[in-house]
Amino acid sequence: MSGNQREIRANTWAGVKREDEPTVTLVSGYKVRDVTFSKNEACPTFMLANINPRFDIDYNLSHIEDIVQVAHKVGANILVFPELCISGYVWDTDHKAEVQEQLKTSHNNQPEVKKVLDGIKSGLVDHDKGLNMVFFGNVRMDRSHGKIHDSTFVMTQGADYNDIFYDKIFLTPMEKLFFHRGSDRRLVLDARFGRMGVMMCYDLCFVEMGKMYAFTDEVDVMITTAAWRMETVREYPLLKLRIDNYYQFIWRLMHSALAAHNQVWSIGANCVGVFEKTGGRFCGESGVWSPSGIPLVHASHDEEELIVIRDLEIRGHMRHQAKEHFDYSLDFDEVYRAIKNIKPKRVSLDGL
């Protein structure tokens, strides 16, 4: 970047002011950033794992077990891990056989994986006074069709986690080398505190999916698991503008847009730090965005951290009521309607 160019710094959250920084403490060796949203203790407490999964299944499983114990200690009700947190992320075609072998040995029914997952499940509760739900990203082997999917599973005490899953629909070009596209079937979860929809990473870039969840399924909150990268450059030389971490910028933008456009909460758990196989970085910043589009709390962009947001009033701030503290003056339900698929009026501007 030349000396007179201006750099857009992606690790500053423009326009969002906070009087006090969230408390950060060490719990069992993990940094925990802890905030409280409301005084309504009947609302759920979320914990988001902003972590760096390795290409090492045993390490990842041990890491996950430790974080689950932290969730118990801090009183979290819902714990969200990032995408492919058991296998580690995929990389290039030169190592395709190695990646495929890793994926095959990390699925939920592999003995060592199943042992850990079943142990976590046995510690869950079926009420609101403890950890009762865990979202985690892993490989799903569809043996009936011989397909491998990049999936998010939902673990509760009373159900088989292999039965509650979402297969990622919008795969990146790299992911298409290793996974099959999901079937377009969304996953909607009804809980006492509200209705949840599940998305994964690149899904955030496709607005139709969020719209379907919000206006057809009427969810209150979107849960997104991700392995979202940080670095790529966008530059406008004549304006002397450059951003080196464009993907990080988009991570924030997409969550804010998803929340504000659809008047839902957006909660994202992302990988963070250097990806050992490529040297590239994941942008972290796992966080919570309110229906206003404003980020309420987020994790580090460069190191592992656990985010806790207590007593999150999901249903009390959903889009139907339009009582969230934002500047929309019109109620979505009174104004919004689907746009009919009719031909546009086209006008030729002669000479222009």
Residue ranges and their predicted role:
Residues G3-D34, H261, W265-L352:
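C-terminal beta-strand edge segments of enzyme domains
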Residues N60, V68-E98, V134-F136, D203, ...:
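Active-site beta-strand/loop signature of hydrolases that rely on acidic residues for catalysis
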Residues H107-F136, L204-L306:
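CN hydrolase (nitrilase-like) catalytic-core segments centered on the catalytic cysteine
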Residues I51, E83, G137-R140, I169, ...:
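Active-site-proximal beta-strand/loop segments in catalytic clefts of secreted hydrolases
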Residues G15-I78, I223:
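N-terminal active-site segment of His-dependent metallophosphoesterases
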Residues D94-P111:
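A charged helix-plus-loop insertion that forms the helical arch/lid used to bind
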Residues M47, F153-M155, G287:
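Conserved hydrophobic/aromatic positions in well-ordered beta-strands
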Residues M141-P237, R242-L253, M318-Y328:
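Active-site catalytic loop in hydrolytic enzyme cores
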